[in-house]
Amino acid sequence: MKPLASLRDIKTRINATKKTSQITKAMEMVSTSKLNRAEKREIVRPYMEKIQEVVAMSASAARSHPMLVSRPVKKTGYLVITSDRGLAGAYNSNVVRLVYPKRSKNAMLPPDEIAIIVIGRVGLSFFRKRNMPVILDITRLPDQPSFADIKEIARKTVGLFADGTFDELYMYYNHYVSAIQQEVTERKLLPLTDFLAENKQRTVYEFEPSQEEILDVLLPQYAESLIYGALLDAKASEHAARMTAMKNATDNANDVIRTLTLSYNRARQAAITQEITEIVAGRNALQ
């Protein structure tokens, strides 16, 4: 009876693994579809670059604007973009681990010297479990978010810098390079000093009304658009990471199925051989 029991156990494991591989394959296909849609949103890049050029040119003559001036840093803000779901490999852990050591290094400092803004349930859970100061969060965003979906948190984030809640703001997210490569990115968002350093005036425009009045409206909107752009980038990375993770899981499941099938065939062959041996032995005993 033992060989039969062993055969049943192996068969049960094969069936269970097949069901798992079907699930991971379906998730891989869904993520592939979502990634294809997310990649189409990359067409906004030329528009963003043109806006960036205009803002840089406008700001070049008005560097005294509060959003363009570095000030003594008493408090630093971290905007961390994660996902609402797991099963995406190291997508989330790579981002939060980049931020967490910074908090650890500043562990002796008062908590009010650090402020964390989180997009995504995974990051929110991570930071709250470690009693880190999360002052703003948003979860349950759609897989293809529109600007309206994050307009409120983007506006509040820029407003927190403007009213002095923190003196500088860094963004952390996964930058989409390709379907098989995503890079964890740290980018200083506010003040826009790095942005000014990267962009030099190349075209001369005439403004009506004044540049200062335009910047009062344009700079906050531009900072909000940078947050939205990072979110789109992160979403594409999330779908790519999940697609890759599910493909690897499916491949591993298929390897396990092949190994178990080989074990099943060997066990079945051994059981048949044993039965034949017992029959032959019984026949010889009767002679």
UniProtKB/Swiss-Prot annotation:
One of its GO terms (biological process) is proton motive force-driven plasma membrane ATP synthesis. GO terms for cellular component: plasma membrane; proton-transporting ATP synthase complex. Keywords: ATP synthesis, Cell membrane, CF(1), Hydrogen ion transport, Ion transport, Membrane, Transport. One of its GO terms (molecular function) is ATP binding. The keyword Transport applies. Gene3D superfamilies: 3.40.1380.10, ATP synthase, gamma subunit, helix hairpin domain (1.10.287.80). It comes from the Bacteria. It is a peripheral membrane protein. It is found in: Cell membrane. InterPro entries: ATP_synth_F1_ATPase_gsu, ATP_synth_F1_gsu. Its main location: membrane. Disulfide bonds: none annotated. The keyword Membrane applies. Belongs to the ATPase gamma chain family. HAMAP family: ATP_synth_gamma_bact. Produces ATP from ADP in the presence of a proton gradient across the membrane. The gamma chain is believed to be important in regulating ATPase activity and the flow of protons through the CF(0) complex. F-type ATPases have 2 components, CF(1) - the catalytic core - and CF(0) - the membrane proton channel. CF(1) has five subunits: alpha(3), beta(3), gamma(1), delta(1), epsilon(1). CF(0) has three main subunits: a, b and c. This is ATP synthase gamma chain.
